[in-house]
A protein has these predicted regions:
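Sec-dependent signal peptide recognition
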Residues: 1-7
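Short, functional N-terminal and low-complexity linear motifs
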Residues: 3, 25-31, 45, 57-60, ...
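N-terminal signal peptide c-region/cleavage motif recognized by signal peptidases
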Residues: 12-14
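Immediate post-signal-peptide N-terminus of mature secreted/exported proteins
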Residues: 17-53
Length: 131
């Protein structure tokens, strides 16, 4: 009888629906930071990625997503979705522009990268400067 009552109470409880993964602020912000770092390292010849750190941060983010209730498939699909990639690229470009990066001016990207490294921001943690 107790099991039946427990089962009925569980079945009647409302299910907690997750927000779409693209609305999870920490996940989106972290992936955008990664996109900013990637753009900087691909533009500035004196800045490179700290690949072990990048990999570690990605795994940390995957664990965070799982703890929030998202599946590995949800996370992978979000990361690989073309629409989301374009949205994140646009947000990364806007961030870079706001930070002083100017398209066609390589040194401006290097300067933003060095500033991020000096600040110790998430973007800066993903990068290393050879200067």
């Amino acid at each position: 009888m107790k099991i039946l009552i427990l089962l009925l109470s569980l079945l009647s409880a409302p299910a907690f629906a997750l927000d779409p993964i693209n609305r999870e602020a920490h996940i989106a912000a972290t992936l955008i930071a990664g996109r900013v770092g990637d753009t900087i390292r691909n533009t500035c010849p004196t800045i490179s990625a700290r690949m072990f750190v990048v990999y570690g941060k990605l795994k940390e983010l995957e664990r965070y997503a799982r703890a929030k209730g998202y599946s590995e498939a949800d996370f992978t699909a979000f990361r690989n979705d073309a629409t989301e990639k374009n949205r994140m690229k646009a947000e990364a470009a806007a961030y870079l522009h706001g930070a002083g990066a100017v398209e066609g001016d390589v040194e401006s990207y290097c300067r933003v990268g060095r500033d991020e490294i000096a600040k110790g921001s998430l973007i800066g943690e993903l990068l290393r400067s050879s200067q």
